[in-house]
Amino acid sequence: MPKKAVVLLSGGLDSSTVLAYALNKGFEVYAISFDYGQRHLKEMKSSEAISKFYNVDRKIVKVDLRSIGKSALTDNIEVPSRDISTIEEEIPVTYVPARNTIFLSIAAAYAESLGTNEVFIGANAIDYSGYPDCRPEYFNAMENALSLGTKIGLKEKFHINVPLQYLSKADIVKLGVKLNVPYELTWSCYKGEEEACGECDSCQLRLKGFMEAGFADPLKYSKYPEFYSKNLVKLRPLKRR
């Protein structure tokens, strides 16, 4: 009988790849998505589409982080457009205070209710926006805290699986292509428009990943950054098996 695992599923490129990865490793996957008052609610539709594609159970948890505020993802603060070369220089206004700590705590509670000590998250510490709760030392500390603070953790160590942690965005895309991830169903843009903006950190890092992997991103963008548009003709269309 396969072991159960809870996968944090936002509907983005990374979390969708991790869900496919966990399934490929033989886990019985239970997805969990968070409606936290984010402006880019389109990602919730993507997480629904991904969970239906893979036919996995998906739990939606509402945690209104707008009451805490101080993030461009939840407040009326402009989402910045930065040069991709400067993205990791400082923590941007899109950082949501303690978001991963809140989400992982709830995901761990869900996992414990299912009788498992396995949680998967699609965080990455290579091509990322510099969020402090995406670093390896953070996940090590959080894993120890959950092992100490849960009933199941007293019997066996709680595992926060971060399989994409040391992969570049290009490597993540390549892994997803190998796993046949339906990237056309995913959503990464921080803005909740009909088309992805192509300017926010998340869009640029995603496009950089596809470009360096040699594939064209299947999503529609209202604007492409120059580094991507000048290489677009060289990129292969993404075709799933």
From Swiss-Prot:
Pathway(s) per entry: Purine metabolism; 7-cyano-7-deazaguanine biosynthesis
GO molecular function list: ATP binding; ligase activity, forming carbon-nitrogen bonds; zinc ion binding
Required cofactor(s): Zn(2+)
Binding-site residues, ATP: L9, S10, G11, G12, L13, D14, S15, S16, T17, V18, L19
The record's free-text note on cofactor binding: Binds 1 zinc ion per subunit.
Domain of life: Archaea
Entries under CDD domains matching the protein: QueC-like
Record keywords, A-Z: ATP-binding, Ligase, Metal-binding, Nucleotide-binding, Zinc
Pfam family for this entry, one: QueC
Catalytic activity: 7-carboxy-7-deazaguanine + NH4(+) + ATP = 7-cyano-7-deazaguanine + ADP + phosphate + H2O + H(+)
InterPro entries the record matches: QueC, Rossmann-like_a/b/a_fold
EC number of this enzyme: 6.3.4.20
Residues that, per the record, bind Zn(2+): C189, C197, C200, C203
Function: Catalyzes the ATP-dependent conversion of 7-carboxy-7-deazaguanine (CDG) to 7-cyano-7-deazaguanine (preQ(0)).
Family label: Belongs to the QueC family.
PANTHER family, A to Z: 7-CYANO-7-DEAZAGUANINE SYNTHASE (PTHR42914:SF1)
Protein name listed in UniProt: 7-cyano-7-deazaguanine synthase
